[in-house]
């Protein structure tokens, strides 16, 4: 997303962020170029999607999280923040080695309608993380952490932390 990425670069420079590398890439479970449609009107969010049929069509490189970590020679990953409009399960599947090796804390947005566009459910994302040894809690609008009932997952932001050994 060139315009969005340029804005991110400007903000990083404006705030004198020194320990930061920025990459204009999509993260998923394969390595390829993908088309993303960026809405022409500001929706107040990063609503770019592979599934919009209007807006500016741009092509971006996509990589797997595991490949990115290997390519960069990272020896530590503590935290992952993901708000990728339904691509969360693809991100997790493309980062299975990272999750097993580093056990990062994960802040992730999960919204049912976005998951449906990618052919899965919020429960699939939840089950993927629980199956990798994570415990999840919902972050309420007031910022409180609430234990989850996997049969009734709300839309919103979730904090997943690795279970203690």
Where are these regions (language model features)?
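Phosphate/nucleotide-binding beta-alpha loop and adjacent structural elements of enzyme active sites
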Residues: 1-165
């Amino acid at each position: 997303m060139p315009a969005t990425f340029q804005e991110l670069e400007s903000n990083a420079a404006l705030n004198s962020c020194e320990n930061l590398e920025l990459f204009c890439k999509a993260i998923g479970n394969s390595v390829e170029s993908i088309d993303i449609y960026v809405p022409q009107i500001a929706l107040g969010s990063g609503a770019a999607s592979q599934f919009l049929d209007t807006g500016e069509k741009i092509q971006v490189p996509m990589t797997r999280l595991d490949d990115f970590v290997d390519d960069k020679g990272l020896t530590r990953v503590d935290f992952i923040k993901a708000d990728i409009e339904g691509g969360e399960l693809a991100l997790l599947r493309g980062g299975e080695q990272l999750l097993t090796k580093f056990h990062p804390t994960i802040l992730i947005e999960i919204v049912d309608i976005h998951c449906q566009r990618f052919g899965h459910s919020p429960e699939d994302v939840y089950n993927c993380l629980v199956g990798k040894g994570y415990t999840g809690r919902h972050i309420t609008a007031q910022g409180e952490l609430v234990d989850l009932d996997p049969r009734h997952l709300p839309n919103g932001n979730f904090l997943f932390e690795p279970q203690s050994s």
